[in-house]
């Protein structure tokens, strides 16, 4: 299928925070840009500047000082379809420079998403972009493909949603899927809040992007939260400095590990939910007793919010505490896990056995958007 660029499938992983897009068969996405649409807050006065009424992705990011930034995908669910269409248009025509009507397109979504969401995705792909064929795959399943396994439990945590999906011999076990609407964006918001306690005020949508950068560069997961808090209180060894875009330097201490600790203790942001170690355990316990051993031994991490240093060791420690004492527990944290959903999509869309799985334009015309529930698990 990949002998020429004419018929190569496109793989587009629409995350709440980043869009990862490229061609099936490639080993990494060609385009990675923020899922942001920005609109000017001010009136344009310079004639001939060619100001636009909206900016997408990196361009919106670079002009953020004069824009209001909006994310069309919240908690993995597309909430603003007009903006989402702009993002897809930008992906096809500006980033990948392809005509979507010539390429089958694989999209991704979070498990347990509303049915209407995938129907609308299908409808826009066929009716607005005229793709010849498309498919919607579950993100966590693709991550498992990328790790070269058919059995395991995936903890996929991105910017908008975190979920545990147990998969056995290639089958996702829907009754055991755990979904947690707490992910990278909530951690960024929490970091904004606790930095305010230090006297640094971050409020606007543009400043949130600065805090996200602080989080990505400096945050880490503590192996033992109480110990780490004590260390931070007694010495300044954990403090790091960060230079803001205007040259001001701020110092950040225990916020570095208090921020991602929320994943293990959602009560930090007032959520009643269990932490990611407990949802993983609960998900395994909802599976058949015979397959739990294989799941414990194949805990695969995926998504940008699993990129914190120390997260794998902490997961190992927490799950070991919950599991039976003789159980062998292994956490797999591939270095490329930030993009493993996309990589899995690239693998899937280039398999010869997958080619009969596409929803074709003809099938869509006959059955309408609801075909997506029959063809895509």
Swiss-Prot record:
Its EC number is 3.6.4.-. One of its GO terms (cellular component) is actin cytoskeleton. It catalyses: ATP + H2O = ADP + phosphate + H(+). Oxidation of Met-46 and Met-49 by MICALs (MICAL1, MICAL2 or MICAL3) to form methionine sulfoxide promotes actin filament depolymerization. MICAL1 and MICAL2 produce the (R)-S-oxide form. The (R)-S-oxide form is reverted by MSRB1 and MSRB2, which promotes actin repolymerization. Monomethylation at Lys-86 (K84me1) regulates actin-myosin interaction and actomyosin-dependent processes. Demethylation by ALKBH4 is required for maintaining actomyosin dynamics supporting normal cleavage furrow ingression during cytokinesis and cell migration. The modification Tele-methylhistidine is found at residue 75. Coiled coil: none annotated. It is an enzyme of class 3 (hydrolase). The modification N-acetylcysteine is found at residue 2. CDD domains: ASKHA_NBD_actin. The modification N-acetylaspartate is found at residue 3. GO terms for molecular function: ATP binding; hydrolase activity. Pfam families: Actin. Signal peptide: none annotated. Shows overlapping but distinct expression patterns with other actins. In tailbud embryos, expressed in embryonic muscle (myotomes). In adults, expressed exclusively in skeletal muscle. The modification Methionine (R)-sulfoxide is found at residues 46, 49. The modification N6-methyllysine is found at residue 86. InterPro entries: Actin, Actin/actin-like_CS, Actin_CS, ATPase_NBD. The keyword Cytoplasm applies. SMART domains: ACTIN (SM00268). Keywords: Acetylation, ATP-binding, Cytoplasm, Cytoskeleton, Hydrolase, Methylation, Muscle protein, Nucleotide-binding, Oxidation. Belongs to the actin family. Polymerization of globular actin (G-actin) leads to a structural filament (F-actin) in the form of a two-stranded helix. Each actin can bind to 4 others. Actins are highly conserved proteins that are involved in various types of cell motility. This is Actin, alpha skeletal muscle 3. It comes from Xenopus laevis. The gene is act3.
């Amino acid at each position: 299928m990949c002998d020429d660029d004419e018929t190569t499938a496109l793989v587009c992983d629409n995350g709440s925070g980043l869009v990862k897009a490229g061609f099936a068969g490639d080993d990494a996405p060609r385009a990675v840009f923020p899922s942001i649409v920005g609109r000017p807050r001010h009136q344009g006065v310079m004639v001939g500047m060619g100001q636009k009424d909206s900016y997408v992705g990196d361009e919106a990011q670079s002009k953020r000082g004069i824009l209001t930034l909006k994310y069309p995908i919240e908690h993995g669910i597309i909430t603003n379809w007009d903006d989402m269409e702009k993002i897809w248009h930008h992906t096809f025509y500006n980033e990948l420079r392809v005509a979507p009507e010539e390429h089958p397109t694989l999209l991704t979504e979070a498990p347990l998403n509303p049915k209407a969401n995938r129907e609308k995705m299908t409808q826009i792909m066929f009716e607005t972009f005229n793709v010849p064929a498309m498919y919607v795959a579950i993100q966590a399943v693709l991550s498992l493909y990328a790790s070269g396994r058919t059995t395991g439990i995936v903890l996929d945590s991105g910017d908008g949603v975190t979920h545990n999906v147990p998969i056995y011999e290639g089958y996702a076990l829907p009754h055991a899927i755990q979904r947690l609407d707490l992910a990278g964006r909530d951690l960024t918001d929490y970091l904004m809040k606790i930095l305010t306690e230090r006297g640094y005020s971050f409020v606007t949508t543009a400043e949130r992007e600065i805090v996200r950068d602080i989080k990505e560069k400096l945050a880490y997961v503590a192996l033992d939260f109480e110990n780490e808090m004590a260390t931070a209180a007694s010495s300044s060894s954990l403090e790091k400095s960060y230079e803001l875009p205007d040259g001001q330097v701020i110092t950040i201490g225990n916020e570095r590990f208090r921020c991602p600790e929320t994943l293990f203790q959602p009560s930090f942001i007032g959520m009643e939910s269990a932490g990611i170690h407990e949802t993983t355990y609960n998900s395994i316990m909802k599976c058949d007793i015979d397959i739990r051993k294989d799941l414990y031994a194949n805990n695969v991490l995926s998504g940008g919010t699993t990129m914190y240093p120390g997260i794998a060791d902490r997961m190992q420690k927490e799950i070991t505490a919950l599991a039976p004492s003789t159980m062998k527990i292994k956490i797999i944290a591939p270095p490329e896990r930030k993009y493993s959903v996309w990589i899995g999509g690239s693998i899937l869309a280039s398999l010869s056995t997958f080619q009969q799985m596409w929803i074709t334009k003809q099938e869509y015309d006959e059955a309408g958007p609801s075909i997506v529930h029959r063809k895509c698990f």
